[in-house]
Amino acid sequence: MVYKTKLGEIEISDESIFTFEKGIPGFEHLRKFALVFPQETFPIGWLLSLEDSEVGLPVVDPKLVRADYDPAVPSEDLEEIEAENQEALLFFCVLTIPPGKPEKTTINLRAPIILNQKKKKGIQTILENEDYQLRHLLSEEIERSKTVV
């Protein structure tokens, strides 16, 4: 189906659509989002609202940025998205890209977006691990990962 989104009108398959029962912090009134990976921005993807064409969050697989990223998801969050365990879940972290200053891009490792592909449900959780902050400079995390791997 074709949807009007922050990235323009795009074809979105049902497999890419997820329901966030409680919305996403800051967008609690929005429930339906699609995860898309345009060729122009890959490996950065977009979590696009299907209810408000102005809302779209740039996201990336945190393992591409921090090789040792190992979130411990609270059990109540796993229950909310009907996940039996973490193994079958997809994790994405939101990027903040300042206009005109892409070198200042930060990644939010503290509050990942978690998607249950099987149930098509998602949640943004807040992790207890204090090593993960709301704003990590993306370039520093990529450099750090080179020494970890």
From Swiss-Prot:
Record keywords: Bacterial flagellum biogenesis, Chaperone, Cytoplasm, Translation regulation
Name this protein carries in UniProt: Flagellar assembly factor FliW
InterPro entries: Flagellar_assembly_factor_FliW, Flagellar_assmbl_FliW_dom_sf
Assembly behavior: Interacts with translational regulator CsrA and flagellin(s).
GO BP terms: bacterial-type flagellum assembly; regulation of translation
Biological role stated in the UniProt entry: Acts as an anti-CsrA protein, binds CsrA and prevents it from repressing translation of its target genes, one of which is flagellin. Binds to flagellin and participates in the assembly of the flagellum.
Superkingdom as given in the UniProt entry: Bacteria
Family annotation (Gene3D superfamilies): BH3618-like (2.30.290.10)
Stored HAMAP family: FliW
Subcellular localization, as worded in the UniProt entry: Cytoplasm
Any one GO CC term of the record: cytoplasm
Pfam families (alphabetical): FliW
Family: Belongs to the FliW family.
